[in-house]
Structures are given as structure tokens and as C-alpha cells.
């Protein structure tokens, strides 16, 4: 019983150390069966997929170039006057208007 348990543990450890071994063999078999035009792989990537990637990158670059770049200031924001510079006319007029006086409520005696 102990011998069987040890064998199972050894087999489990050996398969855990090299789990892709069967996959590598099967992928080599598939590569051998394919015609030579489909075997052209460079760095694990076929020529077709490389061409597809290049076309996608080129189209992405073209679409980015065609899109207008957003301007930094799209809306006019009121600017704070720098010390020593006069305020714009509209702000000067607003400052000259008299402000309504605050009346304190009368207290009942």
C-alpha cells in the first residue's frame, strides 16, 4: 500500500514539473503536418499574424493622426487680474454699482 502511494506521489511530482511536455510534442506534430507556407513562424508568430499586427498598428496611427487634437483651453475662464493691471471694463462696471445695504432686523423690546 505504501509503495503504491509513493508511486502516485512521484508521478504527480514529475508531471507537475513538466506539464507542457505533451503540448510541445503535439505542437511539433501539428507543425510537421502543416504545409510549408503555413510553417513560417518567427519568434512563435506566423507571418500572417505579423502582417495583421502591422496593419492594425498602421491603421491605429492613421486614425490618431486624423483626429483633431483637443485644444488646451476650450472654454473661456475668467482670469484673475495681475497686481498693477486694470480690470476689464465689465468687471469695473460691476464694481462701481452700489451694493444694497444689509438691514438688521429690529429687536422687539
From Swiss-Prot:
Residues 35-109 have a biased composition (Low complexity). It comes from Rattus norvegicus. Induction: By isoprenaline. Prolongend stimulation does not change the percentages of secreted forms (with gliadoralin A 1-90 as predominant form). Keywords: Pyrrolidone carboxylic acid, Secreted, Signal. The modification Pyrrolidone carboxylic acid is found at residue 17. Predominantly proteolytically processed at its C-terminus before secretion to produce the major form gliadoralin A 1-90. Further proteloytically processed after secretion to produce minor forms. Potential substrate of transglutaminase. May play a role in the formation of the protective mucosal protein pellicle involved in the reinforcement and protection of oral mucosal epithelial surface. This is Gliadoralin-A. Transmembrane segments: none annotated. Residues 1-16 form the signal peptide. It is found in: Secreted. The keyword Protein biosynthesis does not apply. Residues 107-109 form a propeptide. GO terms for cellular component: extracellular region. Found in saliva (at protein level). Secreted from the submandibular gland. Residues 17-109 are annotated as: Disordered.
Amino acid at each position: 500500500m505504501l509503495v503504491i502511494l509513493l508511486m502516485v506521489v512521484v508521478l504527480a511530482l514529475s508531471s507537475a514539473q513538466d506539464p507542457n511536455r505533451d503540448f510541445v510534442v503535439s505542437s511539433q506534430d501539428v507543425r510537421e503536418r502543416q504545409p510549408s507556407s503555413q510553417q513560417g513562424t518567427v519568434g512563435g508568430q506566423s507571418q500572417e499574424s505579423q502582417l495583421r499586427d502591422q496593419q492594425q498598428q498602421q491603421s491605429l496611427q492613421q486614425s490618431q493622426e486624423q483626429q483633431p487634437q483637443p485644444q488646451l483651453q476650450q472654454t473661456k475662464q475668467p482670469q484673475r487680474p495681475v497686481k498693477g493691471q486694470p480690470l476689464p471694463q465689465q468687471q469695473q462696471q460691476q464694481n462701481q454699482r452700489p451694493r444694497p445695504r444689509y438691514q438688521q432686523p429690529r429687536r422687539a423690546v
